[in-house]
UniProtKB/Swiss-Prot annotation:
Forms part of the ribosomal stalk which helps the ribosome interact with GTP-bound translation factors. Is thus essential for accurate translation. This is Large ribosomal subunit protein bL12. The lineage of its organism: Bacteria, Pseudomonadati, Pseudomonadota, Alphaproteobacteria, Hyphomicrobiales. InterPro entries: Ribosomal_bL12 (IPR000206), Ribosomal_bL12_C (IPR013823), Ribosomal_bL12_C/ClpS-like (IPR014719), Ribosomal_bL12_oligo (IPR008932), Ribosomal_bL12_oligo_N_sf (IPR036235). One of its GO terms (molecular function) is mRNA binding. Belongs to the bacterial ribosomal protein bL12 family. One of its GO terms (biological process) is translation. Homodimer. Part of the ribosomal stalk of the 50S ribosomal subunit. Forms a multimeric L10(L12)X complex, where L10 forms an elongated spine to which 2 to 4 L12 dimers bind in a sequential fashion. Binds GTP-bound translation factors. It comes from Bartonella tribocorum (strain CIP 105476 / IBS 506). Keywords: Ribonucleoprotein, Ribosomal protein.
Length: 123
């Protein structure tokens, strides 16, 4: 414990230039950077949302297309809506079909609706 107290005392007596030199030497010795963690965290926190891949998607029915009956059937199967509700949804496009879906689920729904003749987009 006495050795640590001596090190603390020696570090406390360093001038600003000596402390900067010590910092550079330790960076080289240990292969690290003495960048301020707060600044790095703030920059990383600001950049993180842009870099992160979106995990939740909204499946939007843009247009029912020429084969509305097939699209209505598919909407009913995907959402569990009744015939009238599904018909109103398709005819009232653009409307969300599913909100907060995972990427895989959203892609699956999109491909099923497009196969039925609808125009769909993910947001």
């Amino acid at each position: 414990m006495a050795d640590l107290a001596k090190i603390v005392e020696d570090l406390s007596n360093l001038t600003l230039l000596e402390a900067a030199e010590l910092s550079k030497l330790l960076e080289e010795k240990w292969g690290v950077s003495a960048a301020a963690p707060v600044a790095v965290a703030a920059v990383a926190g600001a950049a993180a949302p842009a870099a992160e891949e979106k995990t939740e998607f909204d499946v939007i029915l843009v247009e029912g297309g020429a084969q509305k009956i097939n699209v209505i059937k598919e909407v009913r199967a995907l959402t569990g809506l009744g015939l009238k509700e599904a018909k109103d949804l398709v005819e009232g496009a653009p409307k969300p079909i599913k909100e907060g879906a995972s990427k895989e689920e959203a892609e699956k729904i999109k491909s099923q609706l497009e196969a039925a003749g609808a125009k769909v987009e993910l947001k």
